[in-house]
Amino acid sequence: MTLVMKSSRFEVEPEALFAFHMDAENLARISPPWPPFVPVSTPQPTRLGDIQVFRVGPWPVARTWQARITQLVPGRLLEDTQEAGPFLRWRHQHRVTPDGDGSRLTDVVAFRLLPTRLGEFIEYLGVRPALWAMFTYRHWRTRRLLANHKG
């Protein structure tokens, strides 16, 4: 599987950063406008085994993305695994760790688009850079939203 990782430091307590990511509604708030990402069903509070459903992409080609919460270590780790969506396989971990007087968020995604060499080529040249850019944007938005909430 192809791996993408993005890590950033935040000037908030790890508990606040983790709580922010436990609210699935925040995903729409931090996602870039490309492609559109709309929550359809996001049980609150987030629990192990929950299924979260989103619509991804512009109308009329939007797809349903269904992910299950497959790991949950309160305050430290939230993992979602795609059950239905655009990827053959998708596992995304949100890891939160203390970092001095703040915290660190590390997003780790392991994915497979297609089970072929062409799929690996597309993943490496297209999907990987797009995901890295998306997580860079999400970390920036998270930082801004947490700063606004804090102040």
Model-identified regions with their sequence ranges:
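Short strand-connecting beta-turns/loops that link adjacent beta-strands
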Residues: 13, 74, 99-102
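Glycine-rich portal/gate segments that line the openings of hydrophobic small-molecule binding cavities
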Residues: 38-84, 104, 140-143, 148-150
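Beta-strand/loop substructures that line and gate deep hydrophobic ligand-binding cavities in soluble
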Residues: 81-132
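Hydrophobic pocket/interface hotspot
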Residues: 17-21, 27, 52, 69, ...
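Short, surface-exposed coil-to-beta transition loops
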Residues: 3-5, 62-66, 89-92
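Generic structural detector for well-ordered beta-strands
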Residues: 7-11, 55, 68, 95-97, ...
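A non-catalytic, amphipathic alpha-helix used as a structural packing/dimerization or gating element
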Residues: 133-141
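Hydrophobic ligand-binding cavity/cleft-lining segments
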Residues: 1-47
